[in-house]
UniProtKB/Swiss-Prot annotation:
InterPro entries: ATPase_NBD, Type_III_PanK
Keyword Kinase part of the UniProt annotation: yes
Location in or out of the cell: Cytoplasm
Binding site for ATP: 6-13, 134
Class in the EC hierarchy, top level: transferase
Cofactor binding mode and count: A monovalent cation. Ammonium or potassium.
Record-given protein name: Type III pantothenate kinase
Cofactor(s) recorded in Swiss-Prot or TrEMBL: NH4(+); K(+)
Gene: coaX
Keyword Phosphoprotein: no
Organism: Rhodococcus erythropolis (strain PR4 / NBRC 100887)
Length: 271
């Protein structure tokens, strides 16, 4: 079985896959809060506890981290606890199969690369990926699977938290759809601004991408959403076509399999 590890600023998501290629299947996933102070031993103890009896069935590990301190500990953990199985950490120098057509490829987050790979694999054409995480990323992928760049905006939760913490008369509210756009109390007003406002933000960015890039103006372009807040925003969006909850885990699986195939052929993995 393949263990996939997706470390972000807010959460760590683990996914357990059986099979490979078209026969692969995500059997189970787990979520935990990210603690940038966690050591390699603490990470391994937590992961092994979640995996339970599956821990001895792991035949490979693929991981990414957008948190530098955790990335270092992930590397140590893999060597110490899973050094006997093939493992891949997505970072510069690792082959992903995604050409990065940007000014500085090393600046592109591993999560954005992996999402782009999975989206193009699933929909086989030009696509726009919207990841609702700590930040809101809108990434543009060509029909050839090239990463063309994108947009980064604050995330839904971090925006509402900042609003509450920086405003004396406002407090943190539950992020749910309000009764209407026109709120009748402060809580509903904040919920309206968050839910409908972010739907408008995403729609605006997607439409601007379509206007700016002629090849993204047609009906063959797939707009795919992922991330914890995606199910809340999608019903209010006019541009998002698909929800792929496990997009990043699927991308990690693809990166692992591509690197294994490369090693099996005797060729050295390249970016």
């Amino acid at each position: 079985m393949l263990l996939t590890v997706d470390v972000r600023n807010t959460n760590i998501v683990l996914g357990l896959f059986s099979g490979t290629g078209e026969y692969s299947k995500l059997l189970q996933d787990w979520r935990m809060r990210t603690d940038p102070r966690m050591t390699a031993d603490e990470l391994a103890l937590t992961f092994r506890g979640l995996l339970g009896t599956h821990v001895d069935e792991i035949t490979g590990v693929a991981a990414l981290s957008t948190v530098p301190s955790v990335l270092r500990e992930i590397r140590v953990m893999l060597e110490r606890y899973w050094g006997h199985v093939p493992h891949v950490v997505v970072e510069p120098g690792i082959r992903t199969g995604v050409p990065l057509l940007v000014d500085n490829p090393k600046e592109v987050g591993a999560d954005r690369i992996v999402n782009s790979l999975a989206a193009h694999h699933l929909y086989e054409g030009p696509c726009i990926v919207v990841d609702f995480g700590t930040s809101t990323c809108v990434d543009v992928v060509s029909a050839k699977g090239e990463f063309l760049g994108g947009c980064i905006a604050p995330g839904l939760e971090i925006s509402t938290d900042a609003l509450a913490s920086q405003s004396a008369a406002l407090r943190k509210v539950e992020l749910v759809r309000p009764r209407s756009v026109v709120g009748k109390n402060t809580v509903e007003c904040m919920q309206s601004g968050a839910v409908f406002g972010f739907a408008g933000l995403v729609d605006g960015l997607v439409n601007r991408v379509r206007d700016e890039l002629p090849e993204f103006g047609g009906d063959d372009v797939s707009v795919i959403a992922t991330g914890d807040s995606a199910p809340l925003i999608i019903p209010e969006s006019d541009t998002i076509d698909h929800l792929e909850r496990d997009l990043t885990l699927e991308g990690l699986r693809l990166v692992f399999e591509r690197n294994q195939a490369r090693r099996g052929s005797g060729r050295r993995p390249v970016a």
